[in-house]
Amino acid sequence: MYVLNDKCFYFVRQLNDDPIRQHHADPYGFLTCYDLESKTWETPVLVEDSQSRSDFIVFDSNLYLFHAPIDREHIGILKIDTSDLAGSEVLLQANMGSSCFYPFVQYDENHSLCMSYTVDRKHIRLARVDMAKLV
């Protein structure tokens, strides 16, 4: 969950029980927003996602979601259209080369964007993300 101006953005993983693919359920994330002034929910958007952990960050006045779009070896960045969630777009999907759990994104004391994550739930890594090169 992330509050930006008068909106509360909410993202959680859900499972889509697809009757066509009876052998397994397709994972996806449920992205929506609650307007704190009008007290209304926006129409939710489904985002391909494979784990229940994600994190929001604001960069250059834009809202982004870091999550696992394909499997736990991938990290994805979704640029969120704060005025129309359906207009949100995938900015990046990268293979991390090993399992990547619990991404947490924050700015350091030099205002550089950093992401910590665990590898195989055993080791914690810290990476610097140069968002200016990605957007």
Label each PLM-derived region with a short phrase:
Residues 1-52, 58-98, 108-112, 118-135:
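Beta-rich carbohydrate-recognition and catalytic domains
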Residues 99-103:
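C-terminal regions of proteins
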